Amino acid sequence: MEVLREKYIKEVVPAMMRKFGYKNPMAVPKIEKIVVNIGVSEAVQNPGAIEAAARDLAIITGQKPIVRKARKSIANFHLRKGMPIGLKVTLRGERMYAFLYKLINLALPRVRDFSGVSPNSFDGRGNYSLGLKEQLVFPEIEYDKIDRIRGMDITIVTTAKTDEEAKELLALLGMPFKK
């Protein structure tokens, strides 16, 4: 999907230079990486849940996820240090743009009662996070092939210095923010 990268170069960079007064096109903020995370809490009782979630995440992102292990034991959660409890994928380059295109144009419109993503989910340093309640919004996932519905956290890391710059960058790329 060269679509978003071309849009960034041809439309976003000139618009950002006009709005924020950048002298150099290289100073314009860009998307650095996208991190997709799934917490698999049921992996404590059901070790096969990690494989199922990993398969779904690999299909969605096109990249094999890293298994995240518990850093410390927590007795109330029946959790031991070193147990697999989550999955993470860091997307950069072409896969990152392909995933972002798919998220904006295919997945988010399929979310039930979707009216736009929250404009308040910036972290103060120009990064944006959003959560999805189910992996079924991605067209590659078939309802019959999944063992259970899982949510995921998506963090878009940008080189923007402020939230205002990052919001403008994502809005110009097509992210549907609530009005």
Curated annotation (Swiss-Prot):
GO cellular component: cytosolic large ribosomal subunit
GO molecular function, one term: structural constituent of ribosome
Keyword tags: Ribonucleoprotein, Ribosomal protein, RNA-binding, rRNA-binding, tRNA-binding
Signal peptide: none
Keyword check for DNA-binding: no
Keyword Ribosomal protein carried by entry: yes
GO biological process, one term: translation
Entry-linked Gene3D superfamilies: 3.30.1440.10
Record family assignment: Belongs to the universal ribosomal protein uL5 family.
PANTHER family linked: 60S RIBOSOMAL PROTEIN L11-RELATED
Subunit relationships: Part of the 50S ribosomal subunit; part of the 5S rRNA/L5/L18/L25 subcomplex. Contacts the 5S rRNA and the P site tRNA. Forms a bridge to the 30S subunit in the 70S ribosome.
NCBIfam families noted in UniProt: PRK00010.1
Function: This is one of the proteins that bind and probably mediate the attachment of the 5S RNA into the large ribosomal subunit, where it forms part of the central protuberance. In the 70S ribosome it contacts protein S13 of the 30S subunit (bridge B1b), connecting the 2 subunits; this bridge is implicated in subunit movement. Contacts the P site tRNA; the 5S rRNA and some of its associated proteins might help stabilize positioning of ribosome-bound tRNAs.
Protein name: Large ribosomal subunit protein uL5
Gene source species: Dictyoglomus turgidum (strain DSM 6724 / Z-1310)
Lineage summary: Bacteria, Pseudomonadati, Dictyoglomota, Dictyoglomia, Dictyoglomales
